[in-house]
């Protein structure tokens, strides 16, 4: 299992993401293909969402990668095999931050949650992402409503919120902690306090830091 989980954007160690990709086959003419999942920002106006996706593309291309968006909304309420086929050609995924509850809903409703968990357990994909893209991997998402609006799921998709995470990690990830330049840093300090009070296992990341998983080796850099 290989994961590059950043607090904000690519963080301070994008070379480590490239290194994780070294074991996933060769690059094509445009670089190593990477699927970009941006459904955590499905609540934003279309033009704003497109600009945000574009900024992710620019950053990933600078690393020699070839990004393509896989919009999970295109696979809502369809057979999981369809999203599996869409993701099959990518040795890596990049899951953008935003609202973790929107992201969780999109992953579940498209069937991408089960597909990604299976790919990770078979070490068939490198999972990269930041903020909500890291948080969604926890066993449970309760507590994050202090920062992200859980009601956004019903407002955007007309469905109830899901509180379960993907369970890939055995602990929660709390980004932007001790990051005064990030507007949600104080809110996430409250999430940490809540987790400590409830005994919820968690790791904190400041902006710039990355949680790296490479097989059995887990480090924060």
Role assignments for model-derived ranges:
Residues 1-5, 65-66, 99, 142-148, ...:
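N-terminal start-of-chain detector that recognizes signal peptides
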Residues 87-97, 119-133, 149, 183-193:
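A short, terminal or domain-edge coil/loop segment
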Residues 105-108, 113-179:
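Class I SAM-dependent methyltransferase SAM-binding "motif I" and its flanking Rossmann-like core
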Residues 164-208:
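Conserved anion/nucleotide-ligand pocket segment
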Residues 1-101, 189, 196-221:
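Extended, subdomain-level signal for the structured scaffold at the beginning of enzyme domains
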Residues 47, 105-106, 138-140, 184, ...:
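Short, well-ordered secondary-structure micro-motifs
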């Amino acid at each position: 299992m290989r994961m590059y989980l950043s607090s904000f954007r690519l963080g301070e160690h994008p070379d480590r993401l490239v290194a994780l990709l070294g074991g996933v086959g060769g690059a094509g003419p445009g670089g190593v293909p990477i699927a970009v999942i941006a459904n955590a920002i499905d609540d934003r106006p279309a033009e704003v969402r497109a600009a945000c996706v574009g900024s992710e593309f620019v950053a990933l291309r600078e690393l020699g990668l070839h990004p393509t968006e896989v919009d999970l909304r295109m696979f809502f309420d369809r057979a999981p095999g369809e999203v599996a086929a869409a993701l099959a050609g990518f040795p890596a995924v990049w899951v953008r931050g935003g609202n973790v509850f929107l992201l969780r809903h999109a992953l579940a409703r498209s069937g991408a949650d089960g597909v990604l968990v299976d790919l990770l357990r078979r070490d068939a994909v490198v999972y990269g992402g930041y903020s909500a893209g890291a948080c969604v991997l926890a066993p449970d998402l309760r507590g994050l409503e202090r920062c992200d609006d859980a009601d956004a799921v019903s407002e955007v998709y007309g469905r109830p919120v899901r509180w379960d995470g993907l369970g890939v990690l055995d602990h929660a990830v709390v980004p932007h902690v001790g990051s005064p330049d990030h507007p949600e840093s104080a809110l996430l300090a409250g999430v940490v306090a809540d987790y400590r009070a409830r005994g919820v296992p968690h790791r904190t990341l400041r902006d710039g830091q990355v949680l790296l998983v490479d097989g059995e080796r887990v480090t924060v850099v």
